[in-house]
Amino acid sequence: SFDLSPGRVLGIVGPNGAGKSTLLRLLYRYHKPTSGTVEIGGTDIWKITARSAARKVAAVLQEQPTDFALTVREIVTLGRTPYSVGFGGSNGARDALIVDAALNRMDLNGFSNRSMGTLSGGERQRVMVARALAQEPCVLILDEPTNHLDIRHQLEILELIKDLPLTIITSLHDLN
């Protein structure tokens, strides 16, 4: 059991197989707890719709597909899905502003029209964080955000996320 104040960063550290990812999956509704509750702002995330939960919690997973046939902008725009109107409709100008802000925050403006498959590992990870930011969550969950990245890209990702105005829960197995 833990309580985390808004705007704080919680690092979950442990060796491979210790249950870090399982805990995170409980927090972003991939697994339903067999007992207890997961609450955000006093609301049990299993007592609200998946769409409402996706407006509260965004996750960047340790293993991401890399064969997207989408541009960086299209992937980041997927973060607006919990706010879509009707079947696939968008909130137009507001969504565009939020996507632009997420791209800017992750220093991806020059990449917006590039295909995901042409990016380096660090660039792809920044895209996935930008997609999560476009969800406008209260809580950002990062499962091994520096996994498979060289030291330069690890530092780049950590630098970009450290000042985000969100509650961040991240798992790490490498303390370096």
Regions flagged by a language model, labelled:
Residues Y28:
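Helix-to-loop junction immediately C-terminal to a conserved catalytic motif
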